Amino acid sequence: MYYIARRLAITLSLSSVILGAKAQVAPTDSLGETRRDSVRRLDEVVVYARQMLGSKFEARNRTGSAYYLSPKELKKFGYTDISRMLRAVPGVNIYEEDGYGLRPNISLRGTKAERSERISLMEDGILAAPAPYAAPAAYYFPNVARMYAIEVLKGSSQVQYGPFTTGGAVNMVSTPIPKNFQAGLRTSYGSFGTFNTYAHLGSDHKHVGYLVEYLRYQSKGFKKDEPNERTGFYRNDVVGKLRLHSDEDAEIRQALELKLGFSNEHSDESYVGLSEQDFASRPYYRYRGAQMDQLQTRHTQTALTHLIDFTGGLKVTTSAYYNYFWRNWYKLNDVRIGDQKGEKRSIEEILADPETNARYLDILTGATDRLGEALMLRANQ
């Protein structure tokens, strides 16, 4: 079994303070003219822990290259796949892996796309990966079907959010607590038994706000896997938020928000590919030897965010969070014919040279049974 527990210390985000320099009388010049220091008023810039941009206006006026996918855009297309959402963003390259966006491979500005390991992936400003330099898509990737907005920063402009100054950062903003009572249900059904349902309930009273969300995303899969054709998946997401806040017109405004999240996934996904000949004739086929491959994950998150708004243009956002992740990917790793060490072949060796390893390929595809054969699975943590 594989466990990842991550406790990260408190992060602080400070807005710039409006500075007004008092004009001071300078010495007079030879013409008797009085010179004064120029006075410049700076616009306030507020950076919250849960958002990098917050609007398309901020994205356009942000130093560096930034893009903001608004709630209106996400609602218009209704995508459940992050790969489709990010296709509208310039400088983003993506290649598919499972066809559903469960483990996306995202590249910003030509960085390595595999497992999105060269960019910072965040939800509400908190890293989704177990560590800054880990491959987040290989472990946990937030379910974008419940997201409110998507923010993208490319290049060194995202340095305050992570170490990948060449690539950038992608921040997924979760649904905020509504100002008035809201309840909704959204359901869709498509080919291959693909089903997606999202329900939410929330409100904000005088000093207390809350939100509860549930998302179920599943599919039977589009690949053919004889004899049982188990190539699908299901995912569950439950999120709860509770916020305590002062009056909007208070001299010093404050808010404290608690976020609790739980998600799990069960995927009949496999590392086993196809030989070149089989891929050309039936690209969506899966060998019988891979029918036991299975991925299981669990993820929990606790985040506490405090906001204090002082007079004079200073705002401080403090976030303390804890992430826990567990996964195990049971996958076919080798095919064995006999008891000797030399009678074992890896999947890579078999598919790279199927003619030389024809006996092993027959066992992998289920074409023949041999005495002493074994399909050897590995718990890939």
Q: Which positions does each model-derived feature cover?
A:
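Transmembrane beta-barrel wall of Gram-negative outer-membrane proteins
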Residues: 182, 189-219, 226-270, 294-310
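Acidic/polar loop-and-plug regions of large Gram-negative outer-membrane beta-barrel proteins
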Residues: 243, 252-305, 328-381
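Flexible, solvent-exposed coil segments and beta strand-coil junctions
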Residues: 88, 174-182, 214-224, 277-287, ...
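N-terminal periplasmic "start-of-domain" segments of outer-membrane beta-barrel proteins
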Residues: 39-77, 102-105
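N-terminal periplasmic accessory domains that precede
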Residues: 82-85, 104-110, 119-122, 137-143, ...
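Short acidic/polar hinge/loop motifs at secondary-structure boundaries
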Residues: 126-154, 240
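Extracytoplasmic beta-strand/coil segments of soluble accessory domains associated
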Residues: 58, 83-130
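Outer-membrane beta-barrel pore domains and translocons
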Residues: 50, 155, 173, 186-190, ...
